[in-house]
Amino acid sequence: MRLALATLLLSLAACDAAPPRVDPRGQQLRAELDKLTSDYGKCVDEKIAAADISTDPAGSIAIEAVKACRPIRNALRLKVASFDRFGHPNHTPNQAEAVADASVGVIEKELRENAVVTIVKRQNQMK
């Protein structure tokens, strides 16, 4: 009898498992961040592809390409700050802005470094 009762309780406990947590706002913000990050990278790639690489150093061309994509960078920075405030509601606006600046700074540095490598490869192919 006790065994049957224990089996019944265990089977009922399995039926009442908590549903997976649904976080539509967080998922939406993550998708928006991913799209803006991708758009930022595509913008820099397009600027590099269209750039005249015959005269200027690769670093200068890369810096100009990143600067030309500043509107997307700014939108990404705002979205990162919004995401930080969503995930860390106790953060002050200054903390969220600092997180956004640091996060977007890392992305910008990587895009610039990759752009330099791409430009140098193209310049070497021209020789």
Region roles according to the model:
Residues 12-14:
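C-terminal motif of bacterial Sec signal peptides marking the signal peptidase cleavage site
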Residues 33-36, 50-55, 60-62, 76-80:
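Extracellular/mature segments of secreted proteins
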Residues 1-8:
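Sec-dependent signal peptide recognition
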Residues 63-127:
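Compact alpha-helical subdomains of small soluble proteins
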Residues 16-19:
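Bacterial signal peptide processing site
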